[in-house]
Amino acid sequence: VINRLLTVLTALVSAFNLAAQDNPASWYQNINADYSLQWQQRYYPQQGEPRQAQHYSSAAFSADWYWQSADRRHQLALQPYLRWDQRDSERNLLDLRQAYWQYVGDGFDIKAGVDIVFWGVTESQHLVDVINQTDAVASVDGETKLGQPMLNWNLHGSAGSLELYLLPYFRERSFAGPDGRLRPPFVVDQSQPQYESAQDERNLDFALRWSRRFAALELGLSYFDGNNREALLQPTAQNTLQPQRLQPQYLQMQQLGLDSLWLSGSWIWKLESIYRKTRQQDFVAATAGFEYTHVGVFGSNWDLGWIAEYQYDSRDQQAPVPGQNDIFVGGRLVVNDIGGTEILLGIAQDLDNSGSQSGKLEASTRLGNSSRLSLDAWFFRSKLNTDPLYLIRRDDFLQLSLDYYF
């Protein structure tokens, strides 16, 4: 994987140099460069499995280079990302989140390289977001993604926008190692993943999405065919000399997706729904709800938003993920101060199991012009050993992050 990333990086650097040959001085002046450093500390109040600690430190570096031609037709972007973890080597990462060339024409654009594409509208989970692999060891909510190699063609017109994707290489999901937290009791062996496709990670995945805005309604329809971004974890053959491990297996899947957003005054109504078919099973899942924003609460500059969403999965209790019959409620406070302070608090409750809950707190504010301080907290409760949350019931944590931009 590192060799492939370096190959893409070399190709993008060559593209930058080639584009600079005509007028080097003016070309380099058009490059926007941003950098960031992050320090992160996690604390787990409860003891976990053997080898697991309660304090974890990590550091990350990201660079963001962007160039646009004078006629705004050609764009180059490069965003390498490096992460180091104090204890869990599986969290160490060298990734290209962006490394692409893009051409913008009249009513269309094409892109080749590596990028991150987001689909979705709901707060509590993103069912339709299937282009990129999740960087699962980076965040619990699955919102942090790995860069995905792609060839992308977009058409824009009065009938809406059509996005077409060819995805020639698959990124495996990351899992915590023996020393990491937020993992099953058995360690996931990522050295030999299994694939249903005979092409393994080189299977050519395909995706498309049509979207259009109808007055206050935004509508999106999507289709995906390729390697499932979620892994089935299968027990490996028992070896008396080594502890039991889990092996990831990636099935082929076909998925139809629907996402919609309706704006009505202070109300935002949201829906994400999918139908997914694999060799193992077919199922339907959906998340629907609203966010109501009270502007200027208590006569101040603060904006307070109330969030409520229902999560459904037709697999019911057999679903390997939370959210099969759950409700999520939360609030979002935007202080509108010079530091851009925001606070989000949410709780998800399983309606079939009163003892199964999870909750999160996300708060952040700027410190001066070049730093941002963030506080995140998660808790997990479950007494039923068939509940996915049961595996991480002792992994409540507090996380403090400091980002420096330059």
Describe each PLM feature range.
Residues 53-59, 92-97, 145-149, 202-206, ...:
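Residues that define the transmembrane beta-barrel architecture of outer-membrane proteins
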